[in-house]
Every structure is written in structure tokens, then in C-alpha cells.
Amino acid sequence: MSTHNTKEEFEQAMQKCRELFVKKLHDYGVAWRIMRPETMTDQLYIKAARIRSLQIKGCSKIDEGIVPEFIGIVNYSIIALIQLELGVANTEDISNDKATELYDAQAKKALELMLMKNHDYDEAWRCLLYTS
């Protein structure tokens, strides 16, 4: 059995997700603050449906690959958690810096939860197929 540094792997993956989040903040600001929970679940569904489509078809007309879709799922999930915590706003009511701070706090909570779950489940998730 190979050994994994799950915490390090998580942090590396989250760094890629965070970089894109910050880039999008620079481009669009916190426009997502007006999104209701239903909008967030729709965005997650769209990403999951695209992943499934790419896996089934094995090709796409827009060659972006599957990794950006997984990054999108992570980022939309964190945005949804922020929205649930703050509530929906009618305007862009927080700064980009505050949004990044909230993003980091949710990512930290996710890491802590994953590490606790891994203790209890012995990283059983590593045996799952990513296509499931």
C-alpha cells in the first residue's frame, strides 16, 4: 500500500482552486453575492453534468479538459457555504479581500473535516472510482 500525504495533496489542490477564485474575483468582483442557494446548486449540477458528459463521450468540442470542472465544483461549493453563512445580498456587499478571507476559512473547515473523516474511514474514498 502506498503512503499518501493527504493534507499536502489537499493543500496543493486547494491552491489551484484558490488561484482561480482570486483571479475571478479580480475580473468579476463578488457578483456571486446575489446568487440564491438554488442558483448555486444549479451551478454545481452544470459542472457535474459536464464531467459526466466528458467521461461518457470521451471527447469534447471545447477542449478545456475535466480538471477545470472539478475546480469549479470546489469553488462553487465554497461560495455556496459562504452564501449560506452570510445570507444572500442584493448588492456586492463585501470586498474581494473579505471574500478571500471567507474562502480560506471554508477551505480550512473542509480540510479539518476531511482529516477527521479520514481518521474514521481510513481514506476509503481513495478506493472509489472517480467516475462514480
Task: Show which residues each predicted segment covers.
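Amphipathic, well-ordered alpha-helical segments in soluble domains
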Residues: 40-50, 76, 106
